[in-house]
């Protein structure tokens, strides 16, 4: 079963990390990811740019409004995600727990994927 693991953190805290601290955190995360990748359980992994780089499309009528900037009203922002393929929710939660141990703060939301197509492979 495919699961999405969404990574949330206070963006201002992450952006304030020194380059050395950021590289150390990323190295810890890579160490958690590597065994899952070798086992064929880890799909795409993405670290998103800050919300200041976001553009939002909002449909409240016609036409769709395209707006610069983030509009989430949250204390933590979505900073990245993983797409994983585990047999059980417990396995996905265990992986999310390991990611949390490697990352100083934030939250990891695990959600089962309801629909998935990889258009690069569908053709």
Language model: regions and residue ranges:
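Conserved, structured core segments of small domains
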Residues: 1-123
């Amino acid at each position: 079963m495919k699961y999405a693991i969404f990574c949330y953190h206070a963006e201002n805290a992450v952006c304030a990390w020194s380059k050395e601290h950021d590289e150390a955190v990323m190295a810890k995360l890579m160490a958690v990811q590597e065994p899952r990748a070798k086992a064929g359980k880890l799909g795409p992994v993405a670290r998103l740019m800050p919300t200041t780089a976001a553009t939002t499309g909002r449909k409240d009528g016609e036409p769709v409004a395209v707006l610069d900037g983030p509009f989430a009203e949250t204390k933590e922002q979505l900073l990245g995600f993983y797409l994983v393929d585990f047999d059980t929710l417990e396995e996905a939660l265990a992986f999310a727990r390991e990611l949390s141990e490697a990352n100083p703060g934030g939250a990891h939301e695990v959600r089962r994927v309801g629909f998935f197509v990889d258009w690069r492979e569908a053709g």
